[in-house]
Design a protein with these regions (language model features):
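Phenylalanine-focused residue identity feature
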Residues: 9, 24, 141, 157, ...
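Short secondary-structure transition/capping segments
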Residues: 32-41, 66-75, 90-104, 124-134, ...
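Helix N-terminus capping/helix-initiation residues
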Residues: 2, 60, 149, 167, ...
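Acidic-enriched, low-complexity/disordered segments with a strong bias for Aspartate over Glutamate
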Residues: 3-4, 19, 25, 29, ...
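Catalytic alpha/beta core domains of metabolic enzymes, predominantly
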Residues: 84-270
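Alpha/beta enzyme core
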Residues: 1-110, 123-131
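Histidine (H) residue identity feature
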Residues: 46, 111-113, 353, 373
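Terminal or standalone catalytic/regulatory effector modules within metabolic enzymes
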Residues: 192-202, 206-375
Length: 375
Protein backbone atom coordinates (compact mmCIF):
# COMPACT_ATOMS: atom_id res chain seq x y z
CA UNK A 1 0.00 0.00 0.00
CA UNK A 2 1.06 3.59 -0.60
CA UNK A 3 2.29 5.52 2.43
CA UNK A 4 -0.81 7.72 2.58
CA UNK A 5 -3.06 4.65 2.93
CA UNK A 6 -0.89 3.25 5.72
CA UNK A 7 -0.87 6.60 7.53
CA UNK A 8 -4.65 6.95 7.23
CA UNK A 9 -5.20 3.41 8.48
CA UNK A 10 -3.09 4.06 11.58
CA UNK A 11 -4.79 7.41 12.17
CA UNK A 12 -8.30 5.94 11.99
CA UNK A 13 -7.38 2.85 14.03
CA UNK A 14 -6.18 4.97 16.92
CA UNK A 15 -9.11 7.39 16.57
CA UNK A 16 -11.45 4.39 16.90
CA UNK A 17 -9.86 3.23 20.14
CA UNK A 18 -7.00 0.91 19.21
CA UNK A 19 -4.27 1.38 21.81
CA UNK A 20 -1.44 -0.69 20.35
CA UNK A 21 -0.57 -0.89 16.67
CA UNK A 22 1.42 -4.09 16.06
CA UNK A 23 3.56 -3.55 12.97
CA UNK A 24 5.43 -6.31 11.17
CA UNK A 25 6.91 -7.15 7.81
CA UNK A 26 7.03 -10.64 6.36
CA UNK A 27 10.70 -10.21 5.44
CA UNK A 28 11.73 -8.29 8.59
CA UNK A 29 12.69 -5.48 6.20
CA UNK A 30 12.88 -2.52 8.57
CA UNK A 31 12.34 -0.08 5.71
CA UNK A 32 8.81 -1.41 5.29
CA UNK A 33 7.95 -0.61 8.93
CA UNK A 34 9.06 3.00 9.30
CA UNK A 35 5.99 4.70 7.81
CA UNK A 36 3.59 2.91 10.17
CA UNK A 37 5.80 3.54 13.21
CA UNK A 38 6.11 7.25 12.41
CA UNK A 39 2.35 7.52 11.84
CA UNK A 40 1.65 5.80 15.16
CA UNK A 41 4.05 8.12 16.99
CA UNK A 42 2.31 11.12 15.40
CA UNK A 43 -1.10 9.92 16.61
CA UNK A 44 0.25 9.26 20.15
CA UNK A 45 -0.43 5.54 19.85
CA UNK A 46 1.75 2.67 21.05
CA UNK A 47 3.90 1.45 18.17
CA UNK A 48 4.87 -2.17 18.69
CA UNK A 49 7.19 -3.65 16.09
CA UNK A 50 6.93 -7.42 15.71
CA UNK A 51 9.90 -9.33 14.35
CA UNK A 52 8.88 -12.52 12.58
CA UNK A 53 10.81 -15.34 14.24
CA UNK A 54 12.21 -18.11 12.11
CA UNK A 55 15.10 -20.54 11.85
CA UNK A 56 18.02 -20.65 9.44
CA UNK A 57 21.74 -20.02 9.50
CA UNK A 58 21.23 -16.28 8.89
CA UNK A 59 18.95 -15.89 11.92
CA UNK A 60 21.54 -15.86 14.70
CA UNK A 61 21.32 -14.22 18.13
CA UNK A 62 23.45 -11.40 16.71
CA UNK A 63 20.85 -10.92 13.97
CA UNK A 64 18.00 -10.61 16.48
CA UNK A 65 19.99 -8.29 18.74
CA UNK A 66 20.88 -6.02 15.83
CA UNK A 67 17.26 -5.98 14.69
CA UNK A 68 16.10 -5.08 18.21
CA UNK A 69 18.47 -2.11 18.29
CA UNK A 70 17.21 -0.91 14.92
CA UNK A 71 13.61 -1.26 16.08
CA UNK A 72 14.32 0.89 19.14
CA UNK A 73 16.17 3.47 17.04
CA UNK A 74 13.23 3.82 14.63
CA UNK A 75 10.93 4.97 17.43
CA UNK A 76 9.03 1.84 18.47
CA UNK A 77 7.49 1.71 21.95
CA UNK A 78 7.84 -2.06 22.38
CA UNK A 79 9.16 -5.14 20.62
CA UNK A 80 7.29 -8.36 19.93
CA UNK A 81 8.81 -11.64 18.85
CA UNK A 82 6.20 -13.12 16.53
CA UNK A 83 6.77 -16.88 16.53
CA UNK A 84 3.98 -17.66 14.09
CA UNK A 85 5.03 -21.28 13.52
CA UNK A 86 5.75 -22.34 17.10
CA UNK A 87 9.43 -22.86 16.26
CA UNK A 88 10.83 -21.27 19.41
CA UNK A 89 11.70 -24.09 21.81
CA UNK A 90 12.15 -23.48 25.57
CA UNK A 91 15.97 -23.41 25.73
CA UNK A 92 16.19 -21.08 22.73
CA UNK A 93 13.53 -18.84 24.28
CA UNK A 94 15.77 -18.32 27.30
CA UNK A 95 18.71 -17.36 25.07
CA UNK A 96 16.65 -15.09 22.83
CA UNK A 97 14.84 -13.19 25.58
CA UNK A 98 18.04 -12.64 27.55
CA UNK A 99 19.81 -11.39 24.42
CA UNK A 100 16.97 -9.00 23.57
CA UNK A 101 16.74 -7.64 27.10
CA UNK A 102 20.50 -7.01 26.98
CA UNK A 103 20.33 -5.19 23.64
CA UNK A 104 17.26 -2.97 24.06
CA UNK A 105 15.43 -1.08 26.78
CA UNK A 106 12.08 -1.71 25.08
CA UNK A 107 9.47 -3.97 26.70
CA UNK A 108 9.59 -7.39 25.03
CA UNK A 109 6.44 -9.38 24.21
CA UNK A 110 6.37 -12.98 23.00
CA UNK A 111 3.74 -14.35 20.63
CA UNK A 112 3.83 -18.03 19.76
CA UNK A 113 1.52 -20.84 18.61
CA UNK A 114 0.89 -24.29 20.07
CA UNK A 115 1.25 -26.04 16.71
CA UNK A 116 4.47 -27.85 17.62
CA UNK A 117 3.36 -28.61 21.19
CA UNK A 118 6.07 -26.68 23.05
CA UNK A 119 4.45 -23.27 23.47
CA UNK A 120 3.51 -23.47 27.17
CA UNK A 121 7.01 -24.60 28.10
CA UNK A 122 8.47 -21.89 25.88
CA UNK A 123 6.39 -19.28 27.70
CA UNK A 124 7.55 -20.56 31.10
CA UNK A 125 11.22 -20.23 30.14
CA UNK A 126 10.67 -16.87 28.43
CA UNK A 127 8.96 -15.43 31.51
CA UNK A 128 11.75 -16.71 33.74
CA UNK A 129 14.25 -15.05 31.36
CA UNK A 130 12.52 -11.68 31.70
CA UNK A 131 9.96 -11.38 28.90
CA UNK A 132 7.38 -8.73 29.80
CA UNK A 133 4.21 -9.98 28.07
CA UNK A 134 2.97 -13.28 26.61
CA UNK A 135 0.04 -13.73 24.22
CA UNK A 136 -2.55 -16.38 25.15
CA UNK A 137 -6.05 -17.45 24.09
CA UNK A 138 -9.09 -18.45 26.12
CA UNK A 139 -9.24 -22.25 26.37
CA UNK A 140 -12.09 -22.82 23.84
CA UNK A 141 -9.93 -21.11 21.24
CA UNK A 142 -6.53 -22.32 22.47
CA UNK A 143 -3.97 -25.00 21.56
CA UNK A 144 -3.47 -26.51 18.11
CA UNK A 145 -2.63 -23.70 15.72
CA UNK A 146 -3.69 -21.12 18.32
CA UNK A 147 -1.94 -19.98 21.52
CA UNK A 148 -1.55 -21.64 24.93
CA UNK A 149 -4.65 -21.35 27.11
CA UNK A 150 -4.92 -18.22 29.24
CA UNK A 151 -6.33 -20.12 32.22
CA UNK A 152 -3.51 -22.66 32.19
CA UNK A 153 -0.78 -20.01 32.16
CA UNK A 154 -2.54 -18.05 34.91
CA UNK A 155 -2.62 -21.17 37.10
CA UNK A 156 0.98 -22.05 36.24
CA UNK A 157 2.23 -18.66 37.46
CA UNK A 158 0.02 -18.59 40.57
CA UNK A 159 1.94 -18.06 43.83
CA UNK A 160 5.18 -17.40 41.95
CA UNK A 161 7.01 -14.11 41.35
CA UNK A 162 5.13 -13.99 38.03
CA UNK A 163 1.59 -14.28 39.48
CA UNK A 164 -0.80 -12.50 37.08
CA UNK A 165 -3.42 -11.70 39.70
CA UNK A 166 -6.18 -12.81 37.32
CA UNK A 167 -9.21 -14.59 38.80
CA UNK A 168 -9.45 -18.15 37.46
CA UNK A 169 -13.15 -18.35 38.35
CA UNK A 170 -13.95 -15.34 36.17
CA UNK A 171 -11.81 -16.73 33.36
CA UNK A 172 -13.77 -19.97 33.58
CA UNK A 173 -17.01 -18.05 33.11
CA UNK A 174 -15.61 -16.51 29.93
CA UNK A 175 -14.53 -19.94 28.68
CA UNK A 176 -17.98 -21.41 29.42
CA UNK A 177 -19.60 -18.63 27.39
CA UNK A 178 -17.48 -19.26 24.29
CA UNK A 179 -17.21 -23.06 24.42
CA UNK A 180 -20.46 -23.65 22.43
CA UNK A 181 -19.03 -21.59 19.56
CA UNK A 182 -16.13 -24.00 19.30
CA UNK A 183 -18.50 -26.96 19.22
CA UNK A 184 -20.60 -25.31 16.51
CA UNK A 185 -17.50 -24.65 14.40
CA UNK A 186 -16.41 -28.27 14.71
CA UNK A 187 -19.87 -29.62 13.93
CA UNK A 188 -20.29 -27.42 10.84
CA UNK A 189 -16.84 -28.19 9.48
CA UNK A 190 -15.76 -24.55 9.77
CA UNK A 191 -12.98 -25.72 12.09
CA UNK A 192 -10.90 -28.61 10.76
CA UNK A 193 -9.89 -31.08 13.52
CA UNK A 194 -6.50 -31.43 11.80
CA UNK A 195 -5.44 -28.01 13.12
CA UNK A 196 -6.33 -28.79 16.74
CA UNK A 197 -3.62 -31.28 17.61
CA UNK A 198 0.16 -31.21 17.80
CA UNK A 199 1.99 -31.35 14.49
CA UNK A 200 5.70 -32.01 14.96
CA UNK A 201 6.15 -31.43 11.22
CA UNK A 202 6.01 -27.74 12.11
CA UNK A 203 9.51 -28.08 13.53
CA UNK A 204 10.63 -30.14 10.54
CA UNK A 205 9.21 -27.89 7.83
CA UNK A 206 8.85 -24.56 9.71
CA UNK A 207 5.22 -24.16 8.67
CA UNK A 208 2.99 -21.79 10.74
CA UNK A 209 -0.43 -22.90 11.91
CA UNK A 210 -2.36 -20.56 9.61
CA UNK A 211 -0.30 -21.80 6.69
CA UNK A 212 -1.08 -25.41 7.58
CA UNK A 213 -4.78 -24.54 7.49
CA UNK A 214 -4.42 -22.86 4.10
CA UNK A 215 -2.49 -25.80 2.63
CA UNK A 216 -5.14 -28.25 3.79
CA UNK A 217 -7.86 -26.03 2.31
CA UNK A 218 -6.08 -25.64 -1.05
CA UNK A 219 -5.45 -29.37 -1.40
CA UNK A 220 -9.01 -30.22 -0.35
CA UNK A 221 -10.39 -27.94 -3.07
CA UNK A 222 -8.28 -29.81 -5.64
CA UNK A 223 -9.16 -33.23 -4.24
CA UNK A 224 -5.47 -33.79 -3.54
CA UNK A 225 -5.35 -34.13 0.24
CA UNK A 226 -3.13 -37.19 -0.24
CA UNK A 227 -0.36 -34.80 -1.39
CA UNK A 228 -0.24 -33.05 2.01
CA UNK A 229 3.06 -34.53 3.23
CA UNK A 230 4.66 -34.02 -0.18
CA UNK A 231 3.67 -30.36 -0.18
CA UNK A 232 4.98 -29.92 3.37
CA UNK A 233 8.35 -31.28 2.26
CA UNK A 234 8.38 -28.87 -0.70
CA UNK A 235 7.77 -25.80 1.48
CA UNK A 236 11.33 -25.47 2.90
CA UNK A 237 12.78 -25.94 -0.58
CA UNK A 238 10.67 -23.12 -2.00
CA UNK A 239 11.47 -20.98 1.02
CA UNK A 240 15.19 -21.43 0.41
CA UNK A 241 14.76 -20.58 -3.28
CA UNK A 242 13.03 -17.32 -2.33
CA UNK A 243 15.74 -16.03 0.02
CA UNK A 244 14.69 -17.89 3.19
CA UNK A 245 12.03 -15.44 4.39
CA UNK A 246 10.12 -15.98 7.63
CA UNK A 247 6.85 -17.75 6.84
CA UNK A 248 4.21 -15.25 7.85
CA UNK A 249 1.51 -13.36 5.94
CA UNK A 250 1.95 -12.84 3.03
CA UNK A 251 5.22 -14.75 2.48
CA UNK A 252 3.68 -17.91 3.96
CA UNK A 253 0.87 -17.83 1.39
CA UNK A 254 3.36 -17.13 -1.41
CA UNK A 255 5.66 -19.99 -0.45
CA UNK A 256 2.77 -22.34 0.36
CA UNK A 257 0.86 -21.75 -2.86
CA UNK A 258 4.02 -22.13 -4.92
CA UNK A 259 4.81 -25.39 -3.12
CA UNK A 260 1.32 -26.67 -3.98
CA UNK A 261 1.81 -25.76 -7.65
CA UNK A 262 5.25 -27.39 -7.74
CA UNK A 263 3.85 -30.67 -6.40
CA UNK A 264 0.59 -30.78 -8.35
CA UNK A 265 2.17 -29.77 -11.67
CA UNK A 266 4.87 -32.43 -11.37
CA UNK A 267 7.59 -29.92 -12.22
CA UNK A 268 9.05 -27.25 -9.97
CA UNK A 269 8.16 -23.71 -11.12
CA UNK A 270 6.43 -24.92 -14.28
CA UNK A 271 3.79 -22.48 -13.10
CA UNK A 272 4.87 -19.51 -10.98
CA UNK A 273 2.33 -17.28 -9.26
CA UNK A 274 2.38 -13.51 -9.71
CA UNK A 275 3.33 -13.21 -6.05
CA UNK A 276 6.32 -15.52 -6.49
CA UNK A 277 7.47 -13.36 -9.40
CA UNK A 278 6.99 -10.20 -7.35
CA UNK A 279 9.04 -11.45 -4.43
CA UNK A 280 11.86 -12.34 -6.85
CA UNK A 281 11.58 -8.85 -8.35
CA UNK A 282 12.06 -7.28 -4.92
CA UNK A 283 8.54 -5.89 -4.79
CA UNK A 284 8.03 -7.14 -1.22
CA UNK A 285 11.40 -5.92 0.04
CA UNK A 286 14.81 -7.34 0.80
CA UNK A 287 15.25 -10.94 1.94
CA UNK A 288 17.93 -11.94 4.42
CA UNK A 289 19.58 -14.25 1.87
CA UNK A 290 19.90 -14.13 -1.94
CA UNK A 291 17.47 -15.90 -4.27
CA UNK A 292 18.27 -19.15 -6.05
CA UNK A 293 19.67 -17.84 -9.39
CA UNK A 294 18.37 -20.86 -11.32
CA UNK A 295 14.85 -20.20 -10.07
CA UNK A 296 15.20 -16.50 -10.90
CA UNK A 297 16.17 -17.37 -14.47
CA UNK A 298 13.36 -19.90 -14.90
CA UNK A 299 10.62 -17.77 -13.37
CA UNK A 300 11.62 -14.28 -14.52
CA UNK A 301 13.70 -14.77 -17.64
CA UNK A 302 14.48 -11.39 -19.20
CA UNK A 303 12.16 -9.70 -16.71
CA UNK A 304 14.82 -10.09 -14.01
CA UNK A 305 16.40 -6.86 -15.26
CA UNK A 306 13.40 -5.04 -13.77
CA UNK A 307 14.17 -6.16 -10.21
CA UNK A 308 14.30 -3.37 -7.62
CA UNK A 309 16.44 -2.86 -4.51
CA UNK A 310 14.74 0.22 -3.06
CA UNK A 311 11.91 0.25 -0.51
CA UNK A 312 8.95 -0.96 -2.59
CA UNK A 313 6.60 1.78 -1.38
CA UNK A 314 9.02 4.42 -2.69
CA UNK A 315 7.73 3.54 -6.16
CA UNK A 316 4.05 3.96 -5.24
CA UNK A 317 2.24 7.23 -5.86
CA UNK A 318 -0.20 8.47 -3.19
CA UNK A 319 -3.48 6.64 -3.82
CA UNK A 320 -5.93 7.63 -1.09
CA UNK A 321 -7.68 10.31 -3.18
CA UNK A 322 -7.99 7.94 -6.14
CA UNK A 323 -9.43 5.20 -3.93
CA UNK A 324 -11.95 7.58 -2.39
CA UNK A 325 -13.03 8.77 -5.84
CA UNK A 326 -13.62 5.17 -6.95
CA UNK A 327 -15.95 4.36 -4.08
CA UNK A 328 -17.49 7.76 -3.29
CA UNK A 329 -21.01 6.56 -4.12
CA UNK A 330 -20.81 4.12 -1.19
CA UNK A 331 -19.02 6.30 1.35
CA UNK A 332 -20.95 6.89 4.56
CA UNK A 333 -17.98 7.28 6.89
CA UNK A 334 -14.22 7.75 6.56
CA UNK A 335 -13.54 4.14 7.48
CA UNK A 336 -15.38 2.96 4.37
CA UNK A 337 -12.49 4.27 2.29
CA UNK A 338 -10.08 2.04 4.17
CA UNK A 339 -12.36 -0.98 3.89
CA UNK A 340 -12.39 -0.47 0.13
CA UNK A 341 -8.62 0.11 -0.01
CA UNK A 342 -7.93 -3.17 1.79
CA UNK A 343 -10.70 -5.38 0.38
CA UNK A 344 -12.26 -3.70 -2.68
CA UNK A 345 -14.58 -6.52 -3.79
CA UNK A 346 -15.63 -7.64 -0.31
CA UNK A 347 -16.16 -4.02 0.74
CA UNK A 348 -18.25 -3.25 -2.35
CA UNK A 349 -20.48 -6.26 -1.68
CA UNK A 350 -20.90 -5.11 1.92
CA UNK A 351 -21.68 -1.53 0.89
CA UNK A 352 -24.43 -2.79 -1.45
CA UNK A 353 -25.84 -5.02 1.28
CA UNK A 354 -25.77 -2.14 3.77
CA UNK A 355 -27.54 0.12 1.31
CA UNK A 356 -30.21 -2.51 0.68
CA UNK A 357 -30.85 -2.84 4.41
CA UNK A 358 -31.09 0.92 4.84
CA UNK A 359 -33.29 1.69 1.83
CA UNK A 360 -35.20 -1.52 1.33
CA UNK A 361 -33.84 -1.67 -2.23
CA UNK A 362 -31.83 -4.68 -3.32
CA UNK A 363 -29.26 -3.31 -5.79
CA UNK A 364 -28.83 -6.77 -7.32
CA UNK A 365 -32.41 -6.77 -8.61
CA UNK A 366 -32.52 -3.11 -9.63
CA UNK A 367 -32.89 -2.19 -13.30
CA UNK A 368 -30.56 0.80 -13.25
CA UNK A 369 -30.87 1.31 -17.02
CA UNK A 370 -34.61 2.00 -16.80
CA UNK A 371 -34.56 3.43 -13.30
CA UNK A 372 -36.61 0.63 -11.75
CA UNK A 373 -35.83 -0.15 -8.13
CA UNK A 374 -38.03 -2.91 -6.65
CA UNK A 375 -38.63 -2.81 -2.91
Amino acid sequence: YADDVVEYFVQKSIANGIDIIRIFDCLNDIRNLQTAVTACNKEKGHAQVALSYTLGDAYTLDYWMEMAKRVEDMGADSLCIKDMAGLLVPAKATELVQALKDSTSLPVELHTHYTSGVASMTYMKAVEAGVDIIDTAMSPFALGTSQPATEVMVEAFKNTPYDTGLDLNLLSEIADYFRPLREEALASGLMNPKVLGVNINTLRYQVPGGMLSNLISQLKEQGKEDKYEEVLAEVPRVRKDLGEPPLVTPSSQIVGTQAVFNVLMGERYKVATKETKDILLGKYGQTVKPFNPEVVDKVLGEDKKNAITCRPADLLEPELDKIEAEMKQYKQQDEDVLSYALFPQVATDFFKYREAQQTGVDAKTADTKNGAYPV
